[in-house]
Amino acid sequence: MNISSPPPATATPRLSLTDQQHLIDKLEVFKIQGRDKHGQKVLRIVGKFFPARRVSNEAVNNYLEEKIFPNLGERPFSVVYLHTDVNRSGNFPGISTLRSIYDAIPITLKDRLQAVYFVHPGLQARLFLATFGRLLFKSGLCKKLKYVKRLEFLWDQVRRNEVEVPEFVYDHDEELEYRPMMDYGLESDHPRPRVYVAPCTSSTSMMDSSFVSMYSMRCIA
C-alpha cells in the first residue's frame, strides 16, 4: 500500500458529513496499527494527511467515535503522532478542532492512554503547545506527551515492523541525520523550518541517559 503523500490541500467546497468521514477514512489519518513494546495497541496519526480545510469538527468527532474509539478496546494503549510536514496553511486542524477532539474523547479512554509519541516536533508545534497546551488539555495528558526527534528512538518504544510510517517521514528523518543543526534552529530546512525549542516549561530534562532524544512535556500546574 502506498502511503507516501496525499494530494496538496486546495480551497474546495465543504463535502457532506458522510463524504467528509469517507475522506478521513480513505486518507488513513487515524489508524489502529501494531503494538508498543508493552504489547499495547497503537493509534497512529499522520498529521500531514489531515484534510483540515475540508472536514468539520463534527465529521472528525463522528469518525473517531464510530471507527476508532470502539476498536481501542478496554486495555491501555499508546498514540504515535507523526508531525512531519504539518503546516498551518494546509493540514493543521486549528485550536477549536483540537479542543473539540479532546473534549470528545471518553474519560475512560483518556485514563487508558499511556503515552503520546510526538515524532518530529518543530518550533511552531512546541511553541503552540507551550502557549496553548495548558488551555486545551488537562495536565494529565501533557505528562503523557513525549517528543521524539528521530524514528530510531520511536522504535525503542514501538514495535517497528508493526507500524507503517510514510516514506516522507523517513526522508525527513534522514535529512535530519545529515543536517543536525536543523534540530536547533541553526540551519534552515527550506521551505519549512525544523528547529528545537524547550518543551512546555522552561527547564528541559531527559528521561534517562540512554534515551537522549525523547522529552516528556510537563504542563505548568
Q: Where is each model-derived feature located?
A:
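Basic, amphipathic alpha-helical/coil surface patches used to engage anionic, phosphate-bearing ligands
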Residues: 1-221
